[in-house]
């Protein structure tokens, strides 16, 4: 099943019993978070709050709260286990697009051409009179307080826009970048754009500030896009492919786009059937900025981007289960808000796993596996435990071929995809260990690891600035554990042989099992 927009997806989920409408008044301040958190932990449905207290726009939460709904958003209709397997097919597609194998036969060349044609056929198309511009707020009508923006946790600095799909373009690029960055509401038409320095939006902004210093930087934020476009924004799409093209491949139909209506922002294109679109600029700082509050980190002072308006963001409850530190980020000034009639506001919360980002991480883990295997054929499985905050720990299963092989794989994972740059812990195991079973992983660690020999520590590496365990913000250490069987050269002792029952005995007991009535 393919979905043309968010409403189509909501209808499909409702038909499958995967969405529940909440007709009772529920406040966006804390109450929605508590309700969504309880439902997600129980593996329950997406929630559509029809009557959010104090607001007229319905709120959609827990949209991707199970792996099955993530797979449905990518066009795969299956239960959780089958859905995860199907997501590996999407990873194989991305792997083929990222690094196509050279054709060995004429038949292979034909497949490669077919794939290239499929990508070309999914180039987005621009439409006029799009649904996302049925209603336009401008001037004094622009008031973000009219939207039911959630305040998720008691210690949060204020309301937080969480599922905003941010559209940017660098000065030297033809393709647009789509990224999901949280945004703190600080005024009628002002949001703090929290994008980390290595993310696409921040890179585009810095390049623009260098090339066009003192010029406003155009930005659009999409709320309530179709599921394929949203998931395309969080998937490791190859640089040669736009997220809109990838969404078209998932959907099986070209992504329809609309030009923004605000002068200066109209070079950006947004999904034509989106629910709500915010259009505006990051403006240069006018006059001397106010001094930083006492105890706050210093304002950014280096680089062209430092000359733009910034504000102190946070603290907010984050996917780690803790409140993050405050930090300075650019201010996004909203000039216009466009929307569909009867628009739906899409939101989420982040907190101690499991939360929606953790579920997305479990699903996207399956997309990563073929990408890693393309580069490292010895990797046989890969798992990012959701308890590890989506990316901070990885368990790698491999087919070991020589002494020191596990350490090569550790450094390969850390360096291959940007998504693993902040992975703090990597545990490498053999093929006989199920990476998704903590009992087996701990057994391998406690029986195959000598702490001095098999622990790899790497200092002064990039670390998520939200990681308060690191000694300084953004810089910390990483740890690898080689929990594989050791080869000659790695140990001087005779290595233990795992206990395994005789195959003939197991077969006989299988028959007895039923006869005894134990099954």
From Swiss-Prot:
In the bilayer, the protein is annotated as:
Peripheral membrane protein
Gene Ontology terms: biological process? ubiquinone biosynthetic process
Q: Which GO terms describe its molecular function?
A: 3-octaprenyl-4-hydroxybenzoate carboxy-lyase activity; metal ion binding
Where it sits in the cell: the answer is: Cell membrane
| GO CC annotations, alphabetized | cytosol; plasma membrane
Q: Which top-rank group of organisms is this from?
A: Bacteria
Q: What is this protein called?
A: 3-octaprenyl-4-hydroxybenzoate carboxy-lyase
What is the species of this protein?
Answer: Burkholderia pseudomallei (strain K96243)
Per the record, the gene is: ubiD
């Amino acid at each position: 099943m393919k979905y043309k927009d968010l409403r189509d997806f909501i209808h499909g989920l409702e038909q499958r019993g995967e969405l529940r409408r909440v007709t009772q008044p529920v406040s966006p301040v804390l109450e929605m978070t508590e309700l969504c958190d309880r439902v997600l932990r129980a593996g329950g449905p997406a929630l559509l709050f029809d009557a959010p207290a104090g607001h007229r726009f319905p709120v959609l939460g827990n949209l991707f709260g199970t792996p099955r709904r993530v797979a449905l958003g990518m066009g795969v209709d299956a239960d959780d286990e089958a859905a995860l397997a199907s997501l590996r097919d999407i990873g194989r597609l991305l792997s083929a697009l990222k690094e196509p194998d050279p054709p060995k036969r004429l038949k292979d060349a034909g497949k490669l051409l077919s794939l290239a044609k499929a990508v070309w056929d999914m180039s987005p198309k621009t439409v006029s009179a799009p649904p996302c511009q049925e209603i336009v707020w401008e001037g004094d009508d622009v008031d973000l307080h009219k939207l039911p923006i959630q305040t998720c946790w008691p210690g949060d600095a204020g309301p937080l826009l969480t599922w905003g799909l941010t559209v940017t373009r660098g000065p030297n690029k033809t393709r647009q970048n789509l990224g999901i960055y949280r945004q703190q509401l600080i005024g009628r038409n002002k949001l703090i754009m929290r994008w980390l320095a290595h993310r696409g939006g921040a890179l585009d902004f810095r390049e623009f500030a260098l090339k066009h210093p003192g010029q406003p930087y155009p930005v659009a934020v999409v709320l309530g896009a179709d599921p394929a476009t949203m998931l395309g924004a969080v998937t490791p799409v190859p640089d040669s492919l736009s997220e809109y093209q990838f969404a078209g491949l998932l959907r099986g139909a070209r992504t329809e786009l609309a030009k923004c209506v605000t002068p200066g922002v109209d070079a950006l294109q947004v999904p034509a059937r989106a629910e709500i679109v915010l259009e505006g600029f990051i403006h240069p700082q006018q006059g001397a900025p106010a001094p930083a509050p006492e105890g706050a980190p210093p304002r950014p002072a280096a680089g062209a981007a430092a000359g733009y308006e910034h504000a102190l963001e946070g603290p907010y409850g984050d996917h780690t289960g803790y409140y993050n530190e405050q930090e300075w980020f650019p201010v996004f000034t909203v000039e216009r808000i466009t929307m569909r009639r009867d628009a739906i506001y899409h939101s989420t919360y982040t907190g101690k796993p499991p939360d929606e980002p953790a579920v997305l991480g479990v699903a996207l883990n399956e997309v990563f596996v073929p990408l890693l295997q393309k580069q490292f054929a010895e990797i046989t499985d890969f798992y990012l435990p959701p308890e590890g905050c989506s990316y901070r720990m990885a368990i790698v299963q491999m087919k070991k071929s020589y002494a020191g092989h596990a350490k090569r794989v550790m450094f390969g994972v850390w360096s291959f995809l940007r998504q693993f740059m902040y992975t703090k812990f990597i545990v490498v195991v053999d093929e006989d260990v199920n990476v998704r079973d903590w009992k087996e992983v701990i057994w391998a660690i406690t029986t195959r690891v000598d702490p001095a020999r098999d622990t790899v520590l790497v200092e002064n590496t990039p670390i998520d600035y939200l990681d308060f365990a690191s000694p300084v913000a953004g810089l910390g250490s990483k740890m690898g554990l080689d929990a594989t069987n050791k080869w000659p050269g790695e140990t001087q002792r005779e290595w233990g042989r795992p206990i395994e029952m005789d195959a003939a005995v197991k077969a006989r007991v299988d028959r007895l099992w039923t006869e005894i009535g134990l099954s």
